[in-house]
Amino acid sequence: MKKFRWQILIVLITALIVGVILFFLQSQAKPVSVSTPSPISGGTYTEALIGKFLRLNPMLDHFNQPDRDIDRLLFSSLVRFDANGLPVGDLAENWSVSTDGTVFTFNLRMNAVWHDGTPVTTQDVVYTVSLLQSESNLVPEDLREFWKQISISPISDSSFEFSLPIAFSPFLDYLSFQVLPAHLLGNLTLNELVDHPFNLAPVGSGPYRFDSLETENGLITGVNLAAFDYYFGGRPFIDEIRFRYFSDESSAFNAYQEGVVDGLSKIAPADLERVLNQTGLNLYSSRQPRLSIVFLNLRSATAPVLQQAGFRKALMSAVNRQGIIDEVLKGQAVLAQGPIMPGNWAFYDRQASYKYDSDEARQALAALGFSLDAGGNLTIDGAPVQLTLSLQDDPTHLAIGQILQKNWQNIGIAVTLQPKPYDQLVADLESRAYEMTLIDLDLSQTPDPDPYQFWAESQTEGGQNYSQWQNSTASTYLEQARQTSNFDLRKKLYRNFQVLFDEDLPSLPLYYPVYSYAVKDSIKDLKFGPLYNPADRFNNVRSWYIFTGSE
């Protein structure tokens, strides 16, 4: 028994000694440091632009995309838009709206300065708005007429208010214009700005400042920008961004292969496969704000069958829209589910998708009283159903038209194609002198989803309700949606509108094309949402980086 107690004592002493040693070792151990790579400043990004240099001035870049791309980096707007099409502050720190929705009060960021160090003030906004309101034909007519209805009143150097004649919910979307420096240009009209030296060495308030022009044989071949250290959103990581001009997409791609550029601003469908097979080059695609649609004239005296919603739905079911995207557009489009773009905050994702199903189309037509004659032609009351499709006389639209013609022939409908110049196509829409028209609707004016101009009853006579769709309930929804400042109510109203559009199908939405561009994989943290303009690819350029370090 005594021997046993000694054994227990030895075990306890040994355990105590081991514990002391372990405690000592643990107290001497140093914590392991884990390095987390973080973006650091440095590097240069060079991008190929397709087109020519004209002038760097956001009031004059409406018709030249390369200028708009560069201006996006040089200048700032009052508001910009997130991936869902919602307005967020840019130069504007915040804003408020009056209870009746007619007065918008804005406060500018106190740390916003021009590239020459001068603070951005209310006077800069007032001057820029005055240019938009000017009688110059350099401002698009619809934009000029809109701004003539708006008054701007300074409150202080950093605050002001806009007054509208009536409540207009999409107003914020019209504030994406880029602001010009009044202290440098304030005594100049828009026409006087056209040939002003400012356009060759602009001063903006954006994340990058103008550095220099590249020239060759008297022609401008490139533009160099440098990160602006005092940008109100924080200095960008990439030190320099350079742009080089090329005549076409293929020449730009060859320049990438030769190491001249790091990015391609636009990819042609013909070059898509080469880009996909290029090691180290990342392809990015974003939906464009352009809807390819077949407008149906619901009041056409020569095509009364278009007045039947069931017939219109059969037309839609018979169209192989995915086939059009794959065969003609090389996959560079997404199916349209209605008049509001997918990804936008107002898009309702529970609409019918109208799958390609010729058998379903035939059955629907039979249920409506249509029948096929001995030659397989669709008839109603013994008369053949024959329609005419007007379309633009270019290879892409002609190829799409031929697929539509074949699809509808498969259900017995004879369709005659009428290719026309674009201007004539638009003129026929405006005069309602058509049966069916294939056209692309440009929805890029603002990211706001408001489809009022194309589908409201008030736009039937003299407006852009080309289909002449008469649905008083849908029109009421659209009227209310553009007047209320209640976001949740607007969303509900647009949902209700889309449900009615889906049920009645006054025209045939086909697809939204996508914009494709490519950037070398050494450029990191490129994040893209839907594009409302190709220049939107630079929305988060401040976060792009090339190098990392440890913190």
Task: Pin down the residues of each PLM region.
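N-terminal lobe/hinge region of extracytoplasmic solute-binding protein
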Residues: 48-99, 130, 203-205
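A structural "hinge/loop" feature
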Residues: 51-68, 91-93, 118, 171-180, ...
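Gly/Pro-rich hinge or "lid" segments in bacterial periplasmic/extracellular proteins
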Residues: 72, 82, 177-236, 240, ...
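Aromatic- and charge-enriched surface segment that lines or borders ligand/interaction sites
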Residues: 93-138, 161-163, 252-255, 305
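Surface-exposed binding/hinge segments that line
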Residues: 143-188
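Ligand-site clamp/hinge motif
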Residues: 196, 228-274, 405, 414-416, ...
